[in-house]
Amino acid sequence: MSDEAVAAAWAREDLEALSERGLRRYLEPLDSPQGPVVRVGGETLVNFSSNDYLGLAASPTVRAAALAAVERYGVGTGASRLVVGDTAAHHRLETRLAAFERAEAVRLFNSGYAANTGIIPALVGSEDAVFSDALNHASLVDGCRLSRARVCVYPHADVEALTRALAETPARRKLVVTDTVFSMDGDVAPLRDIVAACRAHGAALMVDEAHATGVLGARGAGLCDELGLESEVDLRMGTLSKALGVMGAYVATSREVADLLVSRARPFVFSTALPAHLCAAAEAAVDAVEGDPDLRERLWRNIRRFADGLRGLGVRAEPRSAVFPLILGEPERALDAARRLREAGVLVKAIRPPTVPEGTSRLRFCLSASHTVGHVDLALEALRSVGVRRG
């Protein structure tokens, strides 16, 4: 039997097991641009599954910036930034993001996953300890594992438990990592208290602002911006692929850390550089976030309307972000609810393990500035008519 046949047999066995548990995934391509209404599988549906929180993915201004950069730089970079893949567009975006984040420096990565799995191992190793919230994104979890540091997982948002762990864990270096907005639950980290705990125990702090960038803060720069904690957090990872509508990620930090990542962050060193046209598009998106506060206000009007509607249906809803989970329990229940909502014209995907813990499969609604009042009300009416209730 060939190696290919052996691997295929393994895959068939695993796929059957996933199917039996309701955990097999399938791809479903869109036939339209990303937006509040999409074409998928021959249907036109109102989209509540996208992280395009400000509707910038199809923005004419952002698209025009990308097209102009394609004319100048072409579509690919050909190498890592350390070889010949670096362009003026990369440096302009890093400078623009540093100003946006009020940071000394910014370093770009190809994705949030690449950033988190590169940054953490670049800073800590086998003599060190990393303290990670139990509900952190998988990229932070994997970054911790790859670092070979001792990993201390503290209960979700439990600063007392974090403080005890910091006090009781001997290590050369201590690094705390947390999401600011938790992607599957939509809640917000108790960041002021985490900063205080880090300060008291000499720990560095890294936050993942992926679902806060463009959504929270007076300037749209995330939870650190909202709380005025930019100077208190050592590393702030942000994404270009959610509210900014493009692709890629970055870390806002000190000049020294940004310089170290050029030599130490393996996804940065060993990946072909982000295409220059995406850098240009992201720069235009940052300009839109800072220059058009009405974008965020439209988003927050939709968030408040949806939260009010959920409460009217008897569902507890706290409008702290653009993410609203409806936890239903077992995968089959979430899949069935997603199917019935789709029949009502609403696209919201079922989120199942391992993305979320066992027994907490859910529908995850994501609001966007590009949703109309009619879109929001359609989703609420669909929930009411199909009788979806929290498990």
From Swiss-Prot:
Gene3D superfamilies assigned: Aspartate Aminotransferase, domain 1 (3.90.1150.10), Type I PLP-dependent aspartate aminotransferase-like (Major domain) (3.40.640.10)
GO biological process: biotin biosynthetic process
Enzyme Commission designation: 2.3.1.47
Residues binding substrate, per UniProt: R25, H137, T355
Domain of life according to the entry: Bacteria
Residues the entry annotates as binding pyridoxal 5'-phosphate: G112, Y113, S183, H211, T239
N6-(pyridoxal phosphate)lysine, modified sites: K242
Gene Ontology MF: a single term: 8-amino-7-oxononanoate synthase activity
Cofactor: pyridoxal 5'-phosphate
A Pfam short name: Aminotran_1_2
The keyword Transferase is annotated on this UniProt entry: yes
Pathway linked to the protein: Cofactor biosynthesis; biotin biosynthesis
Catalytic activity: 6-carboxyhexanoyl-[ACP] + L-alanine + H(+) = (8S)-8-amino-7-oxononanoate + holo-[ACP] + CO2
Keywords carried by this UniProt record: Biotin biosynthesis, Pyridoxal phosphate, Transferase
Function: Catalyzes the decarboxylative condensation of pimeloyl-[acyl-carrier protein] and L-alanine to produce 8-amino-7-oxononanoate (AON), [acyl-carrier protein], and carbon dioxide.
Family per record: Belongs to the class-II pyridoxal-phosphate-dependent aminotransferase family. BioF subfamily.
Alphabetical list of NCBIfam families matching this protein: bioF
Subunit structure: Homodimer.
Protein name: 8-amino-7-oxononanoate synthase
Originating organism: Myxococcus xanthus (strain DK1622)
Upper taxonomic lineage: Bacteria, Pseudomonadati, Myxococcota, Myxococcia, Myxococcales
